[in-house]
Amino acid sequence: MDLFYIVLCGILGTSAMSFAMWFITKEGIANADMIRAIGSVITDDNSAFSTGLIIHYIVGIIVAFVYLLFISLFQPQSLWAYTGIGAMIGLFHGVAFAFLLVVVIAEHHPKESYRNAGLEVALAHLGGHVVYGLVVGLVAGIFAIRIIF
């Protein structure tokens, strides 16, 4: 498998998820500003966005490899199968992350503005992870990406 396709899946999936989270925040549905939340764990508010963006994309590329491993286990035969499997992995990942976000991460965040993570924030992250999985699955299906075991 070519590393290029893993990176492509990660970048496009992370971009789609970031856009979805930005849209949710912009529309006032929930405070889903994940990029600044990630960055503000490490640095001050002035550079939180750029730090969070770099971390988010690096993790997104690494997680894309894991998604592609799981997608390959199912040996999908069509674009719909790739996309559906990606979305299901995103759903499971989103449920796990939303739970951790509400129970653990928000409680210990250094910034007060990110400590209030209720149902809306959890659902926003769940949706963001489903979008990520959809896009990773779609790109994997377009290029018929498989990790051979």
Regions found by a protein language model. Give the residues of each.
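Juxtamembrane/disordered regions of integral membrane proteins
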Residues: M1-F149
